């Protein structure tokens, strides 16, 4: 029978009205719309509050949480950075640019003014999307888990594009990466050679970061860079690289964890190759409401159904001094 009640009338455990996308009827209608050739009236009724500006359907809350977790599994930056949720466009974040100070006072002397200076960082909502196809035969197979397939493919494709932008994005229609010279991390050390890294330079990079940030700092570099770094020794002949003692935990350099990404720049003249700092000061702003849109006719002749998936997000380092990067010497 058609759904006649207003979406969102389901109650949670506390007796409060659930948001429309958190209801069982919305979830059922969403997956019916993804699987079926047409959207019957009951499906359209249930999804009326979840249609985005381009005709796609906003995913159910439960599935959105699955997508977010899948993205975290695919994208190292989501597990290291600070992730916030937004509901609309630009998000203004106040950041302290200059800290006030305390001074010693003679008895009876007035207090001097020493205010914090604030600046604002703006996080936008850039659109990131992917397109995938599934055969009608597979989609109509009751044993095929379309929810699991869409989640894994969405995470694999979107996660890779996200991670690349969070590391090297230029901020033009995409997030600003921590390795980007403009808007990214501060340069801590420049190497003596264009295509080499020394143990002393990593030690200098470590101490170029202020002590408060070192307490939660991690190293981030390309796998190819790891091959060079693992061979480095200190003045006592000890390797800087310390293999993980427990399975599943990261290796260490100078007592801090090491993470790798294929999107971190490789060693070459002028490149920013190693980051060291507190990645919690890199903020990822997820706009709520990832959406999927089914395309029935476009691939009808090949017996396939197309799906468009999209999300809006931004990422930016809100405090550049919290992360330092190693910059390779320029050639010449």
Task: Label the predicted regions.
Residues 1-117, 121, 280:
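Assembly-associated, polar helix/coil segments characteristic of icosahedral protein shells
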Residues 107-208, 324-332:
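Alpha-helical scaffold segments that mediate packing/assembly in large oligomeric complexes
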Residues 59-68, 85-92, 168-311, 324-332:
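Extended oligomerization regions of viral-like shell subunits
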Residues 97-102, 129, 138, 160, ...:
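Short loop/turn segments at secondary-structure transitions that flank enzyme active sites
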Residues 53, 72-75, 113-118, 123-129, ...:
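Residue-level signal for pocket-adjacent positions within structured domains
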Residues 8-12, 43, 50, 160, ...:
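Intrinsically disordered, low-complexity peptide-like regions
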Residues 95, 101-105, 114, 141-143, ...:
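Short helix/loop capping segments that flank catalytic or ligand/cofactor-binding pockets
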Residues 40, 64, 74, 90, ...:
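Alpha-helix initiation and N-capping motif
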């Amino acid at each position: 029978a058609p759904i006649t009640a207003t979406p969102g009338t389901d109650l949670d455990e506390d007796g409060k009205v659930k948001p429309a996308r958190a209801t069982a009827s919305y979830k059922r209608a969403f997956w019916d719309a993804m699987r079926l050739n047409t959207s019957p009236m009951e499906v359209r009724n249930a999804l009326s509050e979840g249609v985005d500006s381009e005709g796609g359907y906003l995913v159910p809350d439960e599935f959105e949480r699955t997508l977010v977790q899948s993205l975290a599994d695919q994208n190292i930056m989501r597990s290291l950075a600070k992730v916030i949720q937004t509901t609309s466009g630009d998000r203004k974040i106040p950041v302290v640019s200059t800290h006030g100070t305390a001074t010693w006072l003679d008895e009876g002397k007035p207090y001097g003014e020493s205010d914090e200076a604030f600046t604002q960082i703006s996080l936008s909502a850039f659109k990131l999307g992917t397109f995938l196809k599934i055969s009608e035969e597979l989609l109509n197979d009751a044993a095929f888990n379309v929810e699991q397939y869409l989640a894994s493919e969405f995470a694999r494709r979107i996660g890779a594009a996200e991670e690349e932008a969070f590391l090297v994005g230029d901020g033009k229609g995409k997030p600003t990466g921590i390795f980007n010279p403009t808007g990214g991390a501060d340069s801590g050390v420049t190497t003596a050679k264009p295509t080499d890294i020394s143990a002393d330079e990593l030690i200098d990079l470590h101490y170029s970061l202020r002590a408060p940030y070192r307490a939660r700092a991690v190293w981030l570099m390309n796998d190819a860079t790891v091959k060079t770094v693992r061979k480095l020794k200190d003045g006592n002949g000890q390797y800087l690289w310390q293999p993980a003692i427990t399975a599943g935990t990261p290796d260490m350099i100078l007592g801090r964890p090491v993470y790798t990404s294929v999107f971190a720049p490789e060693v070459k003249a002028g490149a920013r190759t190693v980051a060291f700092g507190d990645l919690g000061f890199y903020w990822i702003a997820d706009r709520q409401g990832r959406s999927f849109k089914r395309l029935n006719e476009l691939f009808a002749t090949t017996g396939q159904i197309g799906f468009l998936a999209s999300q809006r997000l931004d990422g930016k380092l809100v405090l550049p001094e919290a992360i330092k990067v190693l910059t390779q010497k320029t050639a010449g």
